Design a protein with these regions (language model features):
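NAD(P)+-binding Rossmann beta1-loop-alpha1 motif at the extreme N-terminus of oxidoreductases
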Residues: 1-65, 90, 95-96, 126-129, ...
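Hydrophobic beta-strand scaffold residues
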Residues: 29, 49, 117-118, 201, ...
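Rossmann-fold NAD(P) dinucleotide-binding segment
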Residues: 53-116
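Rossmann-fold dinucleotide-binding core
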Residues: 75, 97-178
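Helical "substrate-binding/catalytic lid" subdomain
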Residues: 167-294
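ATP-dependent carboxylate/acyl-activation modules
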Residues: 310-315
Length: 315
């Protein structure tokens, strides 16, 4: 695949550092973002900004990293979308987390235009991208995947797992984010439990991180839990969307998911607790790790920052 003719759409918390890795790897990237100012830093290091998605219709590979399936559909098929231009990219690579049915519909519409879709959702956040510790899971036509594997691997420093045809990668990412929600909720619960028993959060989480239950994720989130730092990596709203996708998949495939259902209800309580804040909407734009505050509220436990920096493992 000609890596000198690649387009990229989406410059959010994930999209910008992902696209940056491609530019720094020497790929001649043409980019578009709804808010142009978010794309301008990449222009300074060699990317080219276009005026609309339609201007990317002539690229060989079109990559997207956006929030929802509706965003993907609008970018591909909408007014001034990529396919409103004069050409059709050969391969579409979508890194977004969207529903299985919506992805299948997008794939079918692209197939009518002789274009392939490779789904490549990722695991990690913006700091993981920059540290080269992002991973990806991919599905779609094997021939198309082989042509864009180098592009995906450039972004996913920990590697990409090809799992088969169609929307299988979507199922994997939905399952991944279901686990993300359940682990975060449980970690918040046991952290509040330990604190209420008298254990400082840093001491408890340090023990957990060094135990067989520790992980890249628990270590990374420790600083947030210890110092009440809700700098956004992933919002509660997006997590709720993914839990809903997981429950929908469970119903479709007749898989009981009681832990996921309980996590979804616990997360909903966080939206209610947000109404107690001075700026509920702004609060919900913060990080999903703030679930810790909702658990503490329900337990009648007061949280204060311990003001003790903790290494994230991504330094």
């Amino acid at each position: 695949m000609n890596t000198s003719n690649v387009g990229w759409i989406g410059m959010g918390r994930m999209g910008a550092p992902m696209a940056e890795r491609l530019v720094k790897a020497g790929i001649n990237l043409r980019i578009w973002n709804r808010t142009r100012s978010k794309a301008e830093p990449l222009e300074k290091i060699g990317a080219s900004i276009v005026e609309s998605p339609a201007d990317l219709s002539g690229v060989d590979v079109l990559a997207t990293m956006v929030s929802t399936g509706s965003d993907v559909e609008a970018i591909y098929f909408g007014e001034n979308g990529v396919l409103s231009g004069s050409g059709v990219p050969k391969i579409f690579v979508d890194f977004s987390s969207i529903g299985v049915g919506q992805s299948a519909n997008i794939r079918a519409r692209l197939a009518e235009l002789d274009a392939d879709l490779v789904c490549a959702p990722v695991s990690g956040n913006g700091k993981c991208v920059k540290a080269g510790k992002l991973s990806a899971v991919a599905s779609g036509p094997k021939k198309a995947f082989d042509q864009v594997e180098d592009i995906i691997s450039t972004i996913a420093g920990r590697g990409v797992s090809y799992v088969g045809e169609g929307e299988l990668a979507r199922f994997c990412k939905i399952a991944h984010n279901v686990m993300l929600g359940a682990v975060t909720q449980n970690l918040a619960e046991i952290t509040v439990l330990a604190q209420k028993a008298g254990v400082p959060r840093r001491a408890f989480l340090d023990f957990m991180n060094n135990s067989v239950m520790g992980s890249i994720f628990t270590r990374y989130k420790t600083n947030a839990f210890v110092n009440l730092d809700w700098t956004t990596t992933f919002t509660p709203t997006l997590l709720r969307k993914d839990l809903d996708l997981g429950l929908a998949a469970g119903r479709e495939l007749e898989v009981p998911m009681p832990v996921t259902a309980a996590t979804r209800e616990a997360l909903q309580a966080h939206f209610g607790a947000a109404s107690l804040k001075d700026d509920p909407e702004g609060y919900l734009q913060g990080d999903f790790a703030a679930l810790l505050e909702t658990v503490a509220l329900a337990a009648g436990e007061k949280l204060e920052s311990e003001n003790v920096p903790y290494p994230t493992g991504l330094e």
